[in-house]
Amino acid sequence: MNSFMIAFGLASIALCIGAFLRAKIPFLRNMLVPASVIAGLLGVIFMNAMSHFQINIGTDTEMYGNIVNHLFTISFISICLTGASDNKDNTAKNIFKGALGMGTVWCLLYTITPLVGMIIIALIGGGFNMETIYGSLIPYAFTQGPGQAAAYGTIYESYGWENAAMVGMTFAAIGFVMAFLVGVPAAKLGISRGVAKNCGKIDNSILKGYLKKEEQTNYMVKDTTCNSNMETLTFHFALIGLCYVFALGIAKVMSLLPGFLGSSMSGLMFMNGMYAAYIVKFIMKKLKIDFLIEDTLQSKITGWTADYLVVCAFMAVGFNIIGQWIVPIVVEALIVTAITFCVCFYFGRRFGGSNDFERTLGLYGTSTGTVPSGIALVRIVDPEFKTSTAVELGLMNLVMMLSTPVYIALLAMASKTISVQVTMAILAAMTVVYMIVLKVTRCWRKPTFSWKKD
């Protein structure tokens, strides 16, 4: 328990310092780097410095890895407990097309990146005693984020691949940096070239990352419980706890599935958490007590988990463990970043909508970090969310289910049920399938914007 609280406290200190540095350092303000990413970078340096000098601080990177796993499950439970958006400013047809196009390109990247990653590690990993299979961890980190990187890495470890979670979270940390290091200049270039049609002035409050008293607004967070009985916030955390225990039960049931599917599906706690949350919300609706869930408050809880998730994912990276592999990891991450950028900016221009530039930025941010990092990039060029892009980024999660054959193949490879060669053949075939889907659904059309200055 002491180890957990110390880890939580150190992450909190890092977040406070990150918020301060974001407000005071011009480069960080102009690049719109989130405080959580700044905190994570400081945290990973601190943790590894303490480890190098053998200073006992009462916690370690392993504890942060465990925290990431739990926070990720909690974040998905919270997302699923939150109600759907009522945005009606954009046509259903346009929203559907955007979600379908971005979701399919995401699936394409989910297939291409492990294929490229394994080829890279096969070519250069031998000199660093790094097995080819570790190259397949990058899609969990880039296209899904630190939570999935830790979750799937843990499953790989259960099959005998040591330090897979650490490798995955290292990829995720690099991905977050690349999301903003590349995405923000691309957004600013789009503004200067006249591509961003809905861009207003990025005000000082967004740059510095906090709101002064006169800039603050009141959010309509309603009390759904009587405070003398139970705080509304307490009730929402109690629901999350209920769903978490329910998810553990679902994991037990999943473990009864035959072969590698049982061990794999039971280990995907974030998915089990989703199932639990959907079932609990369904029951609450049937009992007509779903009014007790306050969506604005629930979304704030999700944001809380996301901030700590990013920080802890960075602080879970131990250079002393993956130090011998750092060169192939960085090389793979940089090459995959370049491929992700090219794929996003090629297909993003061809979805066939007036908000294709916003979609492109959101897709790139999501494909190197998480959906929140994608939305952060969209906000640069669409600060008032006049387009439907943010909604589409949420809805494309449904299209992401098309990636199921890919992660099943990767887990089968990790469990040694199928060979690396067979897996690579499956990935190559799925790449073709997703490209056909883009063409058939008319999400692969002529460019809708140009980088040439108007």
Residue ranges and their predicted role:
Residues 1, 189-234, 285-291, 443-454:
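Intrinsically disordered, low-complexity non-transmembrane regions of multi-pass membrane transporters
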Residues 309-312, 317-319, 329, 333-443:
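C-terminal transmembrane helix pair
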Residues 1-13, 62-75, 134-139, 264-276, ...:
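Structural signature of hydrophobic alpha-helical transmembrane segments
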Residues 239-351:
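Transmembrane helical segments that form the transport core of multi-pass membrane transport proteins
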Residues 120, 127-163, 186, 203-208, ...:
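Alpha-helical membrane segments and immediately flanking helix-loop junctions
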